[in-house]
């Protein structure tokens, strides 16, 4: 038997299904804007202001589910034998290292999700792995350092919205690994938990983008967990750089002056520069 399924622009937009050559579904491709909620108004400064002032009653229900579901599947990933067991491999001999724990739990959740575990996950920008990456490191850091539950919820607003902000320019589906954006978001959320606000978070975002923006997306599979670990590490490094008085500057590769200009440049890189890359990745994956 053979099957062919095509999705366009976002994860649930099925436009073609064929089985053994028989077309079961075929419909016109919608435009990139159709069926998607516009978030072009987002900015890092606005996200931080929102996190500081939002009535948590308006966002708590979804964030509580994100905490419960995403940590539950992370625990399952550490208990079980899933894929390449990236999470448990990272943790070996480094159980007391908080940065290691953040990478471990995020990777373990992806280990499980990418390799048959049916536990639910609260997503970000249509992706379970992005929802995991944006939330689990922030939750682990808050628990390990004794932050209040309110502080955690507000930090999750930052991490989720920064991830969404980056994905707005990139698009939900692309040749650019979504974990990169979510790892940046995680770094921003942890910066918020440590007391950082716009300046700290903006520098964390720019620094992290400069580190991991070359990672490609080649489908959902076991190595996604390793890419998540690398992306979380980049977010943590971006924050550590700012805390130690170091940064990447405009002109360092694709980095531009200002966080919003850098974010916009990544979107342009992906939408224009990586269009052919996406096609070639699919071609390579389909080779016998």
Label every model-predicted segment.
Residues 126, 138-143, 149-157:
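Active-site cradle of extracellular carbohydrate-active enzymes
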Residues 97-116, 148-166, 205-214:
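Acidic-glycine-rich active-site phosphate/pyrophosphate-binding loop
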Residues 131-147, 187-195:
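Alpha-helical support elements that line or immediately flank enzyme active sites
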Residues 41-95, 101, 190, 195-288:
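Functionally critical mobile loop/hinge segments
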């Amino acid at each position: 038997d053979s099957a062919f399924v095509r999705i366009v622009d976002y994860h649930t937009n099925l436009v073609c299904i064929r089985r053994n050559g028989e077309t079961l579904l075929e419909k016109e491709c919608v435009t990139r804007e159709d069926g998607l909620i516009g978030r072009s108004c987002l900015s890092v400064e606005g996200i931080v202001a929102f996190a500081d002032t939002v009535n948590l009653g308006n966002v708590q229900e979804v964030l509580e589910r994100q905490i419960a579901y995403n940590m539950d599947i992370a625990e399952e990933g550490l208990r079980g034998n899933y894929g390449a067991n990236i999470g448990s491999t990272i943790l070996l001999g480094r159980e007391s290292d908080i940065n290691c724990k953040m990478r471990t739990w995020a990777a373990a959740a992806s280990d499980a999700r990418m390799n048959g575990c049916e536990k639910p996950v609260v997503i970000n920008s249509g992706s379970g792995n992005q929802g995991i990456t944006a939330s689990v490191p922030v939750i682990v850091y808050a628990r390990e350092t004794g932050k209040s539950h309110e502080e955690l919820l507000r930090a999750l607003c930052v991490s989720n919205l920064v991830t969404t902000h980056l994905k707005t320019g990139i698009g939900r589906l692309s040749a650019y690994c979504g974990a990169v954006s979510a790892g940046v978001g995680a770094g921003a959320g942890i910066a918020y938990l440590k007391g950082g606000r716009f300046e700290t978070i903006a520098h964390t975002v720019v620094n992290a983008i400069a580190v991991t923006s070359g990672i490609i997306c080649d489908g959902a599979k076991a190595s996604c967990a390793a890419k998540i670990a690398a992306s979380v590490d980049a977010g943590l490094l971006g924050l550590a750089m700012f805390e130690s008085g170091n940064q990447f500057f405009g002109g360092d590769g694709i980095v531009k002056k200002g966080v919003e200009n850098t974010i916009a440049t990544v979107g342009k890189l992906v939408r224009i520069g990586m269009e052919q890359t996406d096609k070639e990745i699919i071609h390579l994956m389909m080779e016998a």
